Regions:
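Glycine/small-residue-rich loop that forms an oxyanion/phosphate-binding "nest" at active or ligand-binding sites
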Residues: 68-104
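N-terminal glycine-rich anion-binding loop in soluble enzyme alpha/beta folds
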Residues: 2-67
Length: 104
C-alpha cells in the first residue's frame, strides 16, 4: 500500500481503537509494537468491574463498554478491539461484538 499524497503524519493507513481495563499496562504497548507504519492505536480505558457475576454487574460492564466505544468514535478509528480477558470470558461469544457494533 502506498501513502496517499500529503498524508497525515500518523495513521494514514488506519486508526485502530482498543478498549482496556485501567489496570492493564500491556495491551497498548503490544498493539503499538505490532502495527505497521501508517497505523496508529488509540486506547480507551474502562472502569474496573469486580462484580461480573450478577446481572447488575454485567449490565454496568456493558454500559461502560458503550461509553468507551463512544469515546473512541471522534478519533475516527476503523475498528475497535476489546482487550479485557475477564469481560470477554463472561459474555457469550458474539454478544460483545454485537454490543460494540451497535454503538458505532
Amino acid at each position: 500500500m502506498t501513502a496517499p499524497p500529503n498524508p497525515p503524519t500518523y495513521g494514514w493507513r488506519a486508526k485502530l481503537g482498543v478498549i482496556v481495563p485501567p489496570t492493564n499496562t500491556v495491551n497498548e504497548a503490544e498493539w503499538n509494537l505490532a502495527v505497521p507504519d501508517g497505523v496508529t492505536v488509540h486506547a480507551a480505558r474502562m472502569t474496573l468491574h469486580t462484580d461480573t457475576t450478577s446481572v447488575e454487574g454485567l449490565n454496568a460492564l456493558h454500559r461502560d463498554l458503550a461509553e468507551a466505544v463512544h469515546s473512541l468514535k471522534p478519533a475516527g478509528v476503523a475498528a475497535i478491539a476489546y482487550g479485557c480477558t475477564a469481560g470477554s470470558m463472561i459474555t457469550p461469544r458474539h454478544a460483545l461484538a454485537e454490543k460494540m457494533s451497535g454503538e458505532v
